[in-house]
Structures are given as C-alpha cells and as structure tokens.
Amino acid sequence: GAKEFTEDYLEFMRDQQKPLLDMGIATMYLDNFSARGVKHTYRDQSKASIWSTYVDAFMALEYLSKDSKFNKKKIGISGFSRGGNISMMVGEKRIRDALVSKDLYFAAAQPRSPECGMTGMFRNPQPIKETKMWLVHGMADDLTLNGPCVEQAKKMNANGGNVKIDLREGWHHMFTGNFDAEFVKNFQTFYKCPPWYTEDDGSANKEWLDMLLKHSVFKSEKEFDKISKENPKAAFKKIFKGLKREKCIGKGAHVGGDNGKIFMPEYLSFWKKSLID
C-alpha cells in the first residue's frame, strides 16, 4: 500500500530514483490506495480491487503521454506483488483497448512476484507486442507461487508477447526488502484454491464459478456477474466466504530477503536498454 513508499524495509523503491534520473529516466510513483481511503490491503483486499489498479496504470500512461516533457513511446512500469500484477497486466491488449487509445503502450514492464493463479488473469492472454517484459519471481516464494506466472508468461509468448521469465533460486516474496527473510504466520495463501481466470468473453472460468455456486455464496452466474459489476467490494467478500467454505486458504508465508543490492544493477540495466538505448 501507500505506506510502503516511505517504509525503512523498502529502501529499494527509493534507491532506484537517483541512478534512473542520472540516465535521464524520471520516476513516478502510482498510489492506488490513498484516494480510496486505504493504507494497505493485507487485512482486506476488497478495499482496493486489483482490476481497478489496472485502470489506474493506463490512466497514468495516458496522463504522461499528453505531457511534452516525456517520450510517450518510452514509458516503463514496475512493481512487486500486487504491483507485479499491474506490471504484468499492462501488457494485455484488451484492457488497453477498452481504456485508452490503441496507439498507447508501455515500452517495458518489470513485474516482480505477482499472483497469477487467483487474480482473474485472462486464460488466453492477448499481449501488446510492443511491451517488453521481464518477469522476476523467487523460486522460494511461498506466498505467490511462481508456477502460475511462468505458465501465464509462456502463453503470452505463444500469442506474440515478449516476456523474459527469470526465476531466482532461494528468493522469497519481497526479495528486495532490506531485511532477512522471515516467516509471517498471519499471511494468507490461496494456491490450494481453484484457479480463477477470465475467459475470452469476459466471464469467470467454470471451475471457479462451480466452487462459488457449490458453497451457495452466489445463486447463479448471473448473480455473480451482477454483484461483481455493481458492488465489487460485496462480491469480493462473498468470494472470500466461498474460499473459506472450500477450506483452501493457507496460513503463513516467508517474506523478505536482502537481495536489493544484488538485483539493482540488473534492474537499472534493463531500463537503460529498454528506454534509452
């Protein structure tokens, strides 16, 4: 959430600013939370729906594209965890086409540790071919597993995308945090739950819907669609109730790992090659 911009344990986010600026790359931080009255989401993900944050990213792109100080063909995006989801989904053509001009795109995206199995990503992605993507995920990440993201990236590449898959042995979630990895018992995990994908027609996948209907949190697919459109927060709470009844929610995961200084040179090199060279 927004608090992370200033937290001591996330110096990586601030350490990137000066070297990027020295290259001629300005840094803009996109706060998806404060305007929605939220500081963080780890207690209640319904406070800021993940799809609304995809909208935010494209609104930011459109805003920057209208400013003559910036080269609109050389804008990149990066983030970890939910920010990783945003950085991955900005490569989806159908979202872009629904929100902004079809000639706008992020030149490069660098997602870290996104959640790809339980966030409604398209089962059949239609990537924006101009977006060069470098997906980095820790092989020791037990909060958001790398497997679903690897499969998603492979599908993106098969459909004309440009995604480099980079898995790091021993790295956990928040691997650029400047503290040793630690186990947090209160974190919830969802990788044992049925996967949630968005089909080509915009509907949720059958396996996901069947689980929700089985536990009577929605009466029908029609009701699921109606509540999701009219009251996303209420829909999220109903979905969470269904997952609890499915008994697939796990507890506890590792976070951290002082790998920011190791990762930073590669990170800066990616932006130089993608936006400057």
What are these regions (language model features)?
Residues G1-E7, M139:
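Active-site glycine-rich loops that stabilize anionic/oxyanionic intermediates
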Residues E62-S65, G84-L99:
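Short glycine-enriched nucleophile-adjacent loop
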Residues F12, Q45-S68, M89:
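Alpha/beta-hydrolase active-site loop
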Residues N32-V38, E115, W171:
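Short beta-to-alpha linker loops that shape the active-site pocket of alpha/beta-hydrolase fold enzymes
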Residues E7-Y29:
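Short amphipathic alpha-helix adjacent to the substrate-entry channel of hydrolases
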Residues N162-D277:
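C-terminal catalytic histidine-bearing segment of alpha/beta-hydrolase fold enzymes
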Residues K69-S81:
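Alpha/beta-hydrolase fold nucleophile elbow
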Residues S101-G170:
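The feature captures the conserved acid-bearing segment of alpha/beta-hydrolase catalytic domains
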